[in-house]
């Protein structure tokens, strides 16, 4: 499974990029706003660090405006993927953009039915939200599994990006469910490399080594 980082913080991306594990990155208007910088500036810098798909989201809510915004964003870098919300106007925009060769990532997916519609419209990626489904008592991982099964049956090339990842177990679960990609927050990536038994083991090795000196 591919690993994307879900952040607009360049310092976080720089740190994780040194691990050599990043296949891409996702941003959204909330993450960009948190950084207090212009979208174009942030996205350009991310593209210079991560060699893979970088999702940048439109903020318009009607098809024509989305398409115009998407075309401008796509000019920033060859790795830009246009993030578009799952709604009727968004699906119309995805259809237009796919015919122009502009890659899209349909976000705010909460059901396999939505994922199927987005894929049929020409989306390069779909982003089902795992954590937010869990928040309302539904099973976000099961949704990923259903989407993966449907895409496999019908040989749909759209890639699944498991989003709204809250903890390391989510990453494990979506990998087992067949997601092509997980977009993971910085905090969760840092948690993934840690384990209390690893820390105990390192301490024991050092203790034994120092005793032998």
From Swiss-Prot:
Keywords attached to this entry: Cytoplasm, Pentose shunt, Schiff base, Transferase
Superkingdom, taxonomy of origin: Bacteria
One cellular component term from this protein's GO annotations in UniProt: cytoplasm
Pfam families: TAL_FSA
PROSITE patterns recorded: TRANSALDOLASE_1
The reaction(s) this protein catalyses: D-sedoheptulose 7-phosphate + D-glyceraldehyde 3-phosphate = D-erythrose 4-phosphate + beta-D-fructose 6-phosphate
Biological process per Gene Ontology, one example term: pentose-phosphate shunt
Gene3D superfamilies: Aldolase class I
A GO molecular-function annotation: transaldolase activity
Subcellular location: Cytoplasm
Known EC number: 2.2.1.2
Chief localisation class: cytoplasm
Active-site residues from the entry: 83
Involved pathway(s): Carbohydrate degradation; pentose phosphate pathway; D-glyceraldehyde 3-phosphate and beta-D-fructose 6-phosphate from D-ribose 5-phosphate and D-xylulose 5-phosphate (non-oxidative stage): step 2/3
Family that this chain belongs to: Belongs to the transaldolase family. Type 3B subfamily.
General function of this protein: Transaldolase is important for the balance of metabolites in the pentose-phosphate pathway.
Protein name per Swiss-Prot or TrEMBL: Probable transaldolase
């Amino acid at each position: 499974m591919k690993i994307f980082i879900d952040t607009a913080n360049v310092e976080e991306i720089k740190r994780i990029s040194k691990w050599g594990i990043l296949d891409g990155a996702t941003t959204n208007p909330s993450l960009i706003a948190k950084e207090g910088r212009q979208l174009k500036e942030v996205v350009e810098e991310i593209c210079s660090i991560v060699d893979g798909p970088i999702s940048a989201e439109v903020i318009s809510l009607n098809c024509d405006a989305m398409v115009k915004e998407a075309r401008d964003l796509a000019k920033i870098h060859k790795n830009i993927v246009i993030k578009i919300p799952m709604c009727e106007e968004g699906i119309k925009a995805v259809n237009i953009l796919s015919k122009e060769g502009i890659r899209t990532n349909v976000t705010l997916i909460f059901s396999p039915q939505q994922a199927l519609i987005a894929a049929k419209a020409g989306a390069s990626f779909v982003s089902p939200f795992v954590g937010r489904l869990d928040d309302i008592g539904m099973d976000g991982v099961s949704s990923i599994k259903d989407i993966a099964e449907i895409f496999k049956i019908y040989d749909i090339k759209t890639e699944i990006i498991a989003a709204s990842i809250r903890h390391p177990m989510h990453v494990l679960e979506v990998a087992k469910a067949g997601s092509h990609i997980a977009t993971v927050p910085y905090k969760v990536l840092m948690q993934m490399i840690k384990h209390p038994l690893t820390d105990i083991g390192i301490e024991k090795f050092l203790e034994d080594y120092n005793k032998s000196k």
